[in-house]
Curated annotation (Swiss-Prot):
Gene from which this protein is expressed: phaE
GO CC terms, sorted: plasma membrane
Pfam families (alphabetical): MNHE (PF01899)
Organism: Rhizobium meliloti (strain 1021) (Ensifer meliloti)
MF term (GO), any: antiporter activity
PANTHER family: NA(+)/H(+) ANTIPORTER SUBUNIT E1 (PTHR34584), NA(+)_H(+) ANTIPORTER SUBUNIT E1 (PTHR34584:SF1)
Entry protein name: Probable K(+)/H(+) antiporter subunit E
Similarity section: Belongs to the CPA3 antiporters (TC 2.A.63) subunit E family.
Length: 161
């Protein structure tokens, strides 16, 4: 049974998601969902994510609170930008920042945080030069954005490395 469903919980979760998204529980939808979820579970067999150890558990709560606070502030800022769209020009642009992170999971988490923050998007990371390229909806204060990203990176470095 393990060879048919290498990750049973993943297969079940994908099947349930399929049924929710298709808004149908017909036999055909269930069979198609089973096929898709099983194939995707087989595909994930080849993925071998890097394992990381968390070194400073005490920093995790502070990091989460900081990110939540920044996401709330960004939501408000983006809302104001949208509401004032005709009165004030939007100053969007690209920025680069040097990162001192080596752990792949820390980089992945940083990418999730940057992309989940309204008004920002992670675009590219150069591993050799350790430079992040990201987009900001309102690039009014470049130093603030650089400090925010480097602060996240420093927190993640303490947690993961």
């Amino acid at each position: 049974m393990r060879t048919w469903f290498p990750y049973p919980l993943l297969s079940i979760a994908l099947l349930l998601m399929w049924l929710l998204l298709s808004q149908s529980v017909t036999p055909g939808s269930i069979v198609l969902g089973l096929v898709v979820s099983t194939v995707l579970a087989w595909v994930t067999l080849n993925l071998q994510p890097a394992r990381s150890r968390l070194h400073r558990w005490s920093r995790i709560a502070g990091f989460i609170l900081r990110v939540v606070g920044d996401v709330i502030r960004s939501n408000i800022a983006v809302t104001l930008i949208i509401l004032r769209a005709g009165r004030r020009p939007v100053n969007a642009g690209f920025m680069t920042v040097s990162l001192d992170l080596d752990d792949e999971n820390a980089l992945a988490l940083l990418a999730c945080v940057v992309t989940a923050t309204p008004g920002t998007a992670w675009l590219e990371y150069d591993r050799r030069q350790k430079i992040l390229l990201f987009h900001v909806l309102d690039i009014e204060n470049e130093d603030l954005w650089r400090k925010t990203i480097t602060r996240y990176a420093a927190d993640l470095k303490e947690i993961f490395e």
